[in-house]
Design a protein with these regions (language model features):
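An acidic/histidine-cluster motif and surrounding catalytic segment
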Residues: 1-101, 109-120
């Protein structure tokens, strides 16, 4: 089974079909399967509250990953900060679409066991 859902995409220019294709391609590259992946785009306030509640960080972040899988099967919820997504895209001179793909990829890599501190 392969379920990929998106909620509150930050722009209508984003193609859900294209993002799903990117996610499937990334999973295939790492030779893992997708069981269920939910990507939620949330506002600045919601992200700060979640970061405080779940990580005890009193700062903003661009993505939180809740992994329920086993590094071979992706079963996760990603929470992407719409605010940070827009900010990052401007600061890095990228389109919003590219930044969305980067952040989703970042979250998926967390489900595969990569951490922000990994040298790879």
């Amino acid at each position: 089974m392969q379920i990929v859902n998106f909620y509150n995409l930050p722009t209508k220019n984003l193609s859900v079909i294209a993002i799903k294709a990117w996610v499937v391609k990334l999973a295939s590259h790492y030779e893992v399967q997708i069981d269920n992946l939910t990507v939620n785009f949330i506002d600045k306030k919601q992200m700060l509250e979640m970061n405080q509640k779940y990580l005890n960080h009193d700062t903003h972040t661009d993505i939180l990953t809740f992994d329920y899988g086993n590094h071979q099967v992706i079963n996760a919820e990603l929470f992407v900060s719409e605010y940070m997504c827009v900010l990052n895209s401007k600061e890095n001179d990228q389109t919003l679409e590219n930044e969305v793909l980067r952040l989703i990829s970042h979250g998926i890599l967390h489900t595969l066991g990569f951490s922000d501190k990994t040298q790879d």
